[in-house]
């Protein structure tokens, strides 16, 4: 329970409308599993099978697969398995734009029935035409196609302080990027609280945050920055 961040399987989340997944893969013995912090979870291959089946059966949908972290050299396996299982359902860059500009200018008509796959730029496979780069946790790198800022001290705050301080800081970061680099790319707004002391676990932290965060999200369409948001990340649907 200390590492668990969702009660529902990926298949169940897909059926409920989730279209972005933060996936972290660890190589353990002769298998590959999803992990969070020091805790290993379910096997990776069945998850990718569910994703492949969903996108095959729902050709109007678009999925974002954000491989935030790899462990024990798992990126090579993930790369080849994604290529094998998703095949014709991958967004591929076919021009000489920067990948930031390419992703930023994509429209839904370009991505229906496809997955956009992101790796950290420390993986050699990020150079491939169907793998796009994600920024580091502090979002200090230039030209990355996806930003998902995470500063651990913010996520250890109490709910109202987090909303007042952290979310504004993350939004300022992406708007500054858009102004300075001319493109925004995909912006994932990490809105979950975490249990930095490993006492109560993620579920307790999210329940203490849920009411405040739900009100905040309900009011987002009235904000002038609303169009800059691509993904709102939460734990425990």
Q: Whereabouts are the PLM-identified features?
A:
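Catalytic cores of phosphodiester-bond hydrolases, prominently lipid phosphodiesterases
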Residues: 1-237
């Amino acid at each position: 329970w200390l590492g668990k961040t969702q009660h529902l399987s990926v298949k169940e989340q897909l059926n409920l409308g989730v279209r972005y997944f933060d996936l972290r893969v660890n190589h353990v013995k002769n298998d590959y599993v999803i992990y969070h912090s020091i805790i290993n979870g379910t096997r990776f291959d069945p998850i990718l099978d569910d994703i492949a089946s969903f996108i095959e059966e729902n050709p109007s949908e678009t999925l974002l697969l954000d491989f935030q972290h790899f462990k024990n050299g798992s990126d090579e396996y993930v790369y080849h398995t994604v290529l094998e299982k998703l095949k014709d359902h991958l967004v591929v860059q076919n021009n000489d734009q920067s990948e930031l500009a390419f992703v930023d200018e994509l429209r839904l008509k370009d991505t229906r029935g496809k997955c956009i796959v992101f790796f950290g730029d420390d993986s050699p496979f990020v150079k491939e035409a169907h793998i796009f780069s994600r920024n580091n946790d502090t979002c200090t790198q230039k030209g990355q196609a996806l930003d998902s800022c995470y500063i651990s001290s913010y996520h250890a705050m109490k709910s109202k302080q987090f909303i007042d301080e952290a979310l504004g800081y993350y939004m300022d970061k992406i708007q500054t990027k858009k102004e300075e680099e001319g493109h925004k790319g995909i912006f994932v707004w990490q809105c979950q609280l975490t249990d930095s002391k490993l006492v109560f676990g993620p579920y307790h932290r999210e329940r203490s945050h849920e009411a405040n965060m739900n009100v905040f999200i309900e009011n987002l369409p009235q904000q002038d920055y609303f169009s800059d948001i691509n993904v709102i990340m939460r734990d425990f649907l």
